[in-house]
Amino acid sequence: MTGKGRTGGTSRSLKPYAGRGLFMRIVQKYGGTSLADVRKLRLAARRLAGLHQQGVQVVAVVSAQGKLTDELIARARQVNPRGSVREMDAALAAGEQLSASLMAMTIGALGVEAVSLTGWQAGIRTDGEHGAARILRVDTQRLEQELTRGRIPVVAGFQGLDPEGDVTTLGRGGSDTTAVALAAWLRADRCQIFTDVDGVYDRDPRIFPDAAKFGRISYDRMLTLIGSGAQVLHDRSVELAKEKNIRLEVLSAFTGDPGTIVG
């Protein structure tokens, strides 16, 4: 199943999308630095709640907060430096689950119903490659039910369930891939990736003040940049976006500046 993303920002003029008889549907992904503290959680929650109040069906995908994934890895290696990849995946998945619960509660404090979902509760099915699993499909029934009930599903990124019923993780940056997969199987109108930078640059703007931002960049050029060390998007997310024809928007989680369209 494929989906087509639509460009543009999250303006106040958004209205229910009548072109297919459904509300406009948006998937938004928030990275760990975008959720690192209560203030940042509230900023993201207000953006999500605002869209919901405009009649938009919005799904959030969240990463683990701050450096929590690194802390979980350190804890696991402390108890067993050679622990199994299966158990490591089970441990690491907890970081995103915590973020999802905190985000759902933060949205709820704004008077909007939200529900946190693990990757498997959201229907994400993967192969059995622990630590680097690939998404095979998304069973969207639960997500569709929650959207129909008027809730904001907050999905723990980076994780899924393999054919044996075990938890898997998608590798570093895997929450980007989660967002693209949900956008594809839910036939979302937009897939927005919120980060700590306001788009895709030809060089790291935190190191090079004269770095130039792309207004738009092709999938292939984006993959080339990733191959050269750019970390703004996970390579598998761009590959999946290209395969499923999902247009991505890379945006700052902290400013209203225009971002970069990928695709």
Q: PLM features: residue spans?
A:
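Residue-identity detector for glycine
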Residues: 3-9, 19-21
